[in-house]
Amino acid sequence: MGDVEKGKKVFVQKCAQCHTVENGGKHKVGPNLWGLFGRKTGQAPGFSYTDANKSKGIVWBEZTLMEYLENPKKYIPGTKMIFAGIKKKGERADLIAYLKSATS
């Protein structure tokens, strides 16, 4: 498992421009991530997803996020997430640790 504090820095640098994490937070370019773990792709209430996200049908957990965050467009072809991904596994683990603590 990753380091929550390092993960928060990764989130601020690479994710916060498009995503919020707090309960009741607004959608930005990307959906609010509150309740992410255990939720199916394309299911954040009130966010307009692509058909690709809605039909992917996986449940977000450490394993699926680890793969998705490495290369989002490869994992969900047709996603509108315009982010190249995080190549370093340790950095992804830190981000996932932060997301797990911040979104539930």
Curated annotation (Swiss-Prot):
Q: Please state the gene responsible for encoding this protein.
A: cyc
Please tell me what else the database record remarks about this protein: The protein was obtained from food carp that consisted of two cross-bred strains, the European carp and the Amur carp. The isocytochromes may be the result of strain differences. The sequence shown is the iso-1 cytochrome c.
Positions modified as N-acetylglycine?
2
Q: What name has this protein been given in UniProt?
A: Cytochrome c iso-1/iso-2
Instruction: Cite the post-translational modification comment.
Output: Binds 1 heme c group covalently per subunit.
InterPro entries, A to Z: Cyt_c-like_dom, Cyt_c-like_dom_sf, Cyt_c_1A/1B
Q: Which GO terms describe its molecular function?
A: electron transfer activity; heme binding; metal ion binding
**Keywords per UniProt:** Acetylation, Electron transport, Heme, Iron, Metal-binding, Mitochondrion, Respiratory chain, Transport
Concerning its family, UniProt says: Belongs to the cytochrome c family.
Q: Which Pfam families match?
A: Cytochrom_C
Does the keyword Glycoprotein belong to this entry? no
Residues at which heme c binds: 15, 18-19, 81
State if Nucleotide-binding is listed as a keyword.
no
- Alphabetical list of PROSITE patterns matching this protein: CYTC
Q: What does this protein do?
A: Electron carrier protein. The oxidized form of the cytochrome c heme group can accept an electron from the heme group of the cytochrome c1 subunit of cytochrome reductase. Cytochrome c then transfers this electron to the cytochrome oxidase complex, the final protein carrier in the mitochondrial electron-transport chain.
Write down the Gene3D superfamilies for this protein, in alphabetical order. Cytochrome c-like domain (1.10.760.10)
Cellular component GO terms held in the UniProt record = mitochondrial intermembrane space
Where found? Answer: Mitochondrion intermembrane space
Q: What SUPFAM superfamilies does this protein map onto?
A: Cytochrome c (SSF46626)
